[in-house]
Amino acid sequence: MANEPQEHEEGKPFFPPLGDSGEEGPPNIPQDPTPGTPPGPINSKNEDYPPPLENPGPNKSEGPPDGSGNSSPPVTMLVKNNGDRTKQDVSESGGNNSAPNSVESKHTSSSSSAGNGNETKCPDEQNTQECITTIYIPWEDAKPKLMGLVKLDSSDSEEERSPFNKYPKNYKKLRVDMGENWPPGIPPPQLPPRPANLGQKQSATSKNGPQIILREATEVESQQATDGQLNHRVEKVEKKLTCVICLLIGILVLLILLFMLGFLFLLMK
């Protein structure tokens, strides 16, 4: 009867059967320890959680496995030698710890050999043409060799070869007198004649500054006074002219009136 399926009613929790009996029951859940007691191992002999299988490794006391039992596949590497890729099989031997070291040693040796193939060494240090193409050459060693490649003209003097001697430090400064160093065969430029009063006022003010300032102040005051007097005189003349013009206009008006009255008197007779 244990193999028959158990019927389950709706609304009730379902519990799987325990052991060989077909009775339903709660699952085997470990109970919490009673208060006041330290927690201990939880049902270490439970069949639902079997202990993990131990995998004996190389660090165990059994020692390394035999050569006959070694079933690890060979390791394939790509090694670059002089631009060509070739496959190289590396077999592990002498345990798991020795295999990576052997692979690394072979890899480093292959990489070093490949690096040595790409280097360009100078066969003759005296030949500057070939030594310039070297990669690992310091600048202190290459500088005199590069300077030796520059072909100097034997006709040039030592002063002309050196730019510092050819162009002195003060060559950019303006020369005061161009007549001394003027090149021969070229006439010097004709300068305009110097004015006689050039810089006279500046020199006077620099020598007698306060006196010149006072003198100029008095001159300005006198000029203002004369201008004021002239303006006053002009105003007086304008007033006189206006008076004369008004008198003339009045006289003309009176003459016209007298002429009209005399003409009317004659008409009445």
Curated annotation (Swiss-Prot):
Post-translational modification: Phosphorylated by host LCK, SRC and less efficiently by FYN.
Entry-annotated residues carrying Phosphotyrosine: 136
All ranges on the Extracellular side of the membrane: 268-269
UniProt-annotated location(s): Host cell membrane
Biased segments, Polar residues type: 91-101, 114-127
Positions on the Cytoplasmic side per record topology: 1-246
Basic and acidic residues biased stretches: 1-12
A Gene Ontology term for the protein's cellular component: host cell plasma membrane
Skewed-composition ranges (Pro residues): 27-41
Region (SH3B/LBD1): 186-195
Effect of residue 49 to F: No effect on tyrosine phosphorylation and viral ability to transform human T-cell
Membrane topology category: Single-pass membrane protein
Residue numbers spanned by region CSKH/LBD2: 158-167
TM regions (residue ranges): 247-267
Complexes and interactors: Homodimer. Binds SH3 domain of host LYN, HCK, LCK, SRC, FYN or YES. When tyrosine-phosphorylated, binds to the SH2 domain of host LCK, SRC, or FYN.
Biological function: Transforms host T-cells, inducing T-cell lymphomia in the host. Activates at least SRC and LCK tyrosines kinases, thereby activating signaling pathway transforming host T-cells. Human T-cells transformed ex vivo display a IL2 indenpendent growth phenotype.
UniProt protein name: Protein tio
Organism whose genome encodes this protein: Ateline herpesvirus 3
